[in-house]
Amino acid sequence: MATWYELHKKSSGFSQHTHIRYRNMDAASGTSSGIFNILGKGLKLNSKEDISPYLAELEKIEPLHEIHLGGNTLGVGACQALADVLKTKKTLRVADMADIFTGRLITEIPDALRALCDALVDHEQLEEVNLSDNAFGGRSAEPMVNLLTNNRHIRVLKLSNNGLGVSGGTIVADALYESAKHLKDGEKSQLRVVVCGRNRLENGSAIAWARAFAQHRGITEVSLYQNGIRMEGVRALCEGLSDCKDLEVLNLQDNTATLRGSRSVAKALPNWPHLRTLNLSDCLLKSKGGSLLFE
């Protein structure tokens, strides 16, 4: 059994999201193992009984490296049963749980989400968590706090199109801040990629995000597109990222920078010697703002 590691970039609109993938490949057959994938099956799994046939498959996969659950809808009972199995899968590296709550009531989602997140808190090999395209709203941000605060091995966090709003965005950012504050002496943050677009984060949560980024200085990609962030928020984010010397990708597409925000970005640019992608499209830079960036 040959093991190989793949790190690839996938374009999404104007942004590039870093994806970490691990594969255990059988040299003879070429088939992949270590992956549980029910992506896009359109399953409606309400209870433990509904999900049991799939859990039987999951339990057989050893070691487990990835789960891909999107395009199905999971209820509280199903998530709790799934969580019981995931707790035992300490080799998990990629938890792709995007788009798993379509049609679920807002009263269901917090308990279901909490079960899944809490099951992964002690997973030291976990590197990527994707919870995008789930309609959490601000009320469902708190169930993620335990995972985001206490699992300090996560390198890639994707939370796009969740309806977090200012309150939910602040909760998530504060959890990341606390995670960094809990690092032991000499221990460095592992967080490298944060994707949190289409969440109406606005200026109200920008300061919390800036404070979090300032603690995770090894970060290489930040994508906060379509969030209604205005020039004051752009300034805060640039200041928070000023010590992130390894930053390679900054995507603030479809926010409102104007001339004032452009000044903040221009001032911060010398702090990012490795920056290769700066996306400020639809940010109302206008000619003066654009000129500042090119000077």
Regions found by a protein language model. Give the residues of each.
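Leucine-rich tandem repeat or coiled-coil scaffolds
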Residues: 2-9, 13-295
